[in-house]
């Protein structure tokens, strides 16, 4: 189980990313439109002005049961070992263990 402070930090990052999403998108569009290098540098400065935690690359998908940030399956929203346990216990309909 991940510490609750890490999960709260991730939620805070998600809120910041949603808040500054339009600012980042508009400045990226302006950078691609402008031809002069000096004007591009102005927009690069605007792109760097939002907080670092508002960048979408700083977000992690977390397992919604344990909060584990690694080995997540997007389809289920679970980490690998929790997914395996749930499939073994027949808690996920349609999911079967592979055997050969």
UniProtKB/Swiss-Prot annotation:
Cellular compartments annotated = Plastid, Chloroplast
Q: Which InterPro entries match?
A: Ribosomal_uS14, Ribosomal_uS14_bac/plastid, Ribosomal_uS14_CS
Taken from the UniProt entry, a GO cellular component term is: small ribosomal subunit
**So which domain of life are we looking at?**
Eukaryota
Keywords tagged on the record: Chloroplast, Plastid, Ribonucleoprotein, Ribosomal protein, RNA-binding, rRNA-binding
Q: Which Pfam families match?
A: Ribosomal_S14
Biological process according to GO: translation
Subunit composition and interactions: Part of the 30S ribosomal subunit.
Instruction: Give the function comment from the record.
Output: Binds 16S rRNA, required for the assembly of 30S particles.
- Stated family: Belongs to the universal ribosomal protein uS14 family.
Protein name, please? Small ribosomal subunit protein uS14c
Q: Which organism is it from?
A: Ipomoea purpurea (Common morning glory)
Query: Its encoding gene is what?
Result: rps14
């Amino acid at each position: 189980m991940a510490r609750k402070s890490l999960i709260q930090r991730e939620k805070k990052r998600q809120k910041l990313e949603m808040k500054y999403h339009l600012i980042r998108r508009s400045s990226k569009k302006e950078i691609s439109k402008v031809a002069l290098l000096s004007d591009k540098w102005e927009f690069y400065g605007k792109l760097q002005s939002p907080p670092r935690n508002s960048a979408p690359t700083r977000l992690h998908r977390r397992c919604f049961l344990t909060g584990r940030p690694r080995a997540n399956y997007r389809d289920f929203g679970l980490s690998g070992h929790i997914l395996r346990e749930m499939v073994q216990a027949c808690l996920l309909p349609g999911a079967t263990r592979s055997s050969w």
